[in-house]
Amino acid sequence: MTKEKFYEEERKLIEKAKGGDRKAMEDLMDRYEPLFRKLCAGETRMDWEDIRQDLAVSFLEGVRAFTPERGTYFPYYIRQRLYWEKVHLVERMMRRRSVEVQ
């Protein structure tokens, strides 16, 4: 599949997902499953599940908020969004744990 065809297919999925098509949203999430795994790698099982769930919510919100008119490719946009979401999640988890220890 050419890069242009991939992006065109993805753009159509995003439009459908924004319109409420659950199958399109599931297809998008499946496409980005390797990214979810990469971001959760190295975490304990309990943390992994929490982070994975929060990243999925952020992904859904990100699809709805994405505006291709801004000229950003969706893969770049969603990678950045999920990366920073994970950073903030881990910071909150660490703060919560430090409060529990004290």
For the regions a protein language model found, what residue spans apply to each?
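Alpha-helical promoter-recognition and RNA polymerase-docking modules of transcription initiation factors
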Residues: M1-R95
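Internal acidic/polar
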Residues: R96-Q102
